[in-house]
């Protein structure tokens, strides 16, 4: 009797999918991590019944935009800088990411969260963004450059979006709790 090939572990299957279908795998990973992050943040913020619509909308945003945007951004940077990982090149990559993709991601998330998830009128969302976006972005700049440095210096290209998605898991909890506290503060002020 012939022996059957050993079964692949979940990690091996995931890595195989990442190799064969990198964009799809990164998009799904970003979406799943964003959804789980939102469930955790809802529980931490005291919501008794999970708001599935909100979770699904955050999965759609992360899977439809954040994962693919990260995939293409990191791929482009690696091609542009020819895969170099010297200190000067890593610094350039971090600066480029922090001055382009990071502000864009945060701005689009805040717009999406207000208009689509909360169904808040655009004029109110715009006012909220004017008040809170600078603080959110400045806070991101206190630790995301370190994440970027680690990512560009030590993490292979095909894992960079995954690492970023894992960090974004916690960042998403922070942003959600911050957005909720700002909404409550605005409601109390009225």
Curated annotation (Swiss-Prot):
It is a multi-pass membrane protein. The gene is PMP22. One of its GO terms (cellular component) is peroxisomal membrane. Signal peptide: none annotated. Pfam families: Mpv17_PMP22. The keyword Membrane applies. InterPro entries: Mpv17_PMP22. Its main location: membrane. This is Peroxisomal membrane protein PMP22. Residues 1-54, 118-131, 176-190 are cytoplasmic. It is found in: Peroxisome membrane. The chain crosses the membrane at residues 55-75, 97-117, 132-152, 155-175. Keywords: Membrane, Peroxisome, Transmembrane, Transmembrane helix. Belongs to the peroxisomal membrane protein PXMP2/4 family. It comes from the Eukaryota. May be involved in the metabolism of reactive oxygen species. Ubiquitously expressed, higher levels in flowers and green siliques (at protein level). The lineage of its organism: Eukaryota, Viridiplantae, Streptophyta, Embryophyta, Tracheophyta. Residues 76-96, 153-154 are peroxisomal matrix.
